Each structure stands twice: as C-alpha cells, then as structure tokens.
C-alpha cells in the first residue's frame, strides 16, 4: 500500500507545474495535500478512480487540505471538533477498516513567534484528538507538521534555534507525540540519515544548496510497526517549496 503526502503551496499553481503528471505516475492508494490555498469551486480536478475530500479555510487563498483515495472511506470528518482550530481547513480524517488516516497542516508559529502560544494549544488538542481516535483503531497521521524535530532534520540548526519550526517548545511537542505512542516512520528506517529534507525556502537558492528542513512526516501508531515497509522523501519532485513524502505499508 502506497501513501503520499505533499504540501503543494497552492494547488492551482502546482497543477501548472506538473502536479497531475506526478499524481498519475505515483499511483498512490491514498494521496493527500496540504496548503491548497483555494475555495470550493475554484478548481475541478479530474482524478479518475479516486474519491476526493476537501477541507477549505474560511479565509480565502489560505491553508486547506485534501485527500484523494482509491478506496472509499467508511467515514470522513473535517477538523478536530474544536471551533477555534477548525476555521482554517487544517485536518481531514478518513476512517478505513484497518486504520484512521489523518492529514494535517499544522499552524506555523510565524515570524517573531507571534502564534507560538496558539501553536502550543493546537499541539495539545491535536494530540488528544489522535489518541482518542486510537482508542478505536490505529492511526496514520501525515502532513506538514511545521517542525524539524532534531538537529539532523535541518541544514542550519544553530542559526535557527529561535525561529518558527525549530523552537525548543515546538520540538518538545513533537517529542510528546512520539512519547504518546507514535512512530516517526522516516527515522524508524533511517535514524542517522542526514541531508534529507522536505522543505526549502524560495529565498537564497536554498533548494539548489539543499539548505532545507524535514518538516513533512508520516507518523503511525506503534501497533502498525509490523506493517511498515519503507518511508521515502521524494526530493527530486518539483512544483512546490516542499517535496512529497511517502509511506509504504505491507
């Protein structure tokens, strides 16, 4: 089973940069995207053989998520059931027979960490939401989580210690997610791998220099460990400031 997640940084722009070619070539069982930056009706994607589910932000041209799946879910829900968190189209949950599949676009803490306090509340509420799901069946959670967990997860850790995405507070919340019983699948397979990133700033020729961050993840419940086959970061796929990430299950 092949699962793919990609922050497309605007699906309408990404479609102009080869999104559909990659989508069809990948032939994933479940393909999810974050930061769609669109409202309902602004784009009609013809994806034969896939069910489509979209969650739009109230604010136009901002945030948003979508899931495309070959198999129809048993149920689909949008958001996490907390109004203050559910205005930005950040979460879609698809229930399948064997697991819940959750895609997330985690709120960024912003320049000057203006939104860090909100981010901390989000992290706790989202983790609680995942653990509640897990009481019923295992969970796969994937998307742009807007944090580089360890120093090996970004090119320049020392100069970014107090920047959004690499603060001690954000990193601690990711640790708490793992401590709550989730596996960072890429690190499960490649615990010491350096120089592999999923996001590069558009500034300073960052991608050409591979001055990146690994902030896109597939995390799974511990009970799914035996089904893990491989985790990949598809660094050669262009079209966004992020690249897709992949999880293969047995």
Regions found by a protein language model. Name each.
Residues 81-82, 107-123, 158-162:
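Surface-exposed cleft-lining segments at the edges of enzyme active sites
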Residues 51, 125-211, 215:
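Metal-dependent phosphoesterases centered on the DNase I-like endonuclease/exonuclease/phosphatase
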């Amino acid at each position: 089973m092949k699962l793919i997640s990609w922050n497309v940084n605007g699906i309408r722009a990404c479609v102009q940069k080869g999104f559909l070619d990659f989508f069809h070539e990948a032939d994933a069982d479940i393909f999810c995207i974050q930061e769609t930056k669109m409202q309902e009706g602004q784009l009609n994607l013809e994806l034969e053989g896939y069910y489509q589910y979209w969650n739009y932000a109230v604010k136009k041209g901002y945030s948003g998520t979508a899931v495309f799946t070959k198999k129809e879910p048993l149920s689909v829900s949008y958001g996490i059931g907390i109004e203050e968190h559910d205005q930005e189209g950040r979460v879609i949950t698809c229930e399948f027979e064997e697991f819940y599949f959750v895609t997330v676009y985690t709120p960024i803490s912003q320049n000057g960490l203006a939104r860090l306090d909100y981010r901390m509340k989000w992290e706790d509420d989202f983790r609680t939401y995942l653990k509640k799901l897990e009481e019923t069946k295992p969970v796969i959670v994937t998307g742009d989580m807007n944090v580089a967990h360890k120093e090996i997860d970004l090119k320049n850790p020392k100069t970014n210690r107090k920047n959004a995405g690499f603060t001690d507070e954000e990193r601690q919340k990711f640790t708490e997610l793992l401590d709550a019983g989730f596996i960072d699948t890429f690190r499960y397979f490649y615990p010491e791998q350096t120089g592999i990133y999923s996001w590069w700033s558009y500034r300073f020729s960052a991608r050409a220099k591979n001055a990146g961050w690994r902030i896109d993840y597939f995390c799974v419940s511990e009970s799914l460990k035996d089904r893990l086959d491989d985790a990949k970061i598809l660094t050669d796929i262009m079209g966004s400031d992020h690249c897709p990430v992949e999880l293969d299950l047995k």
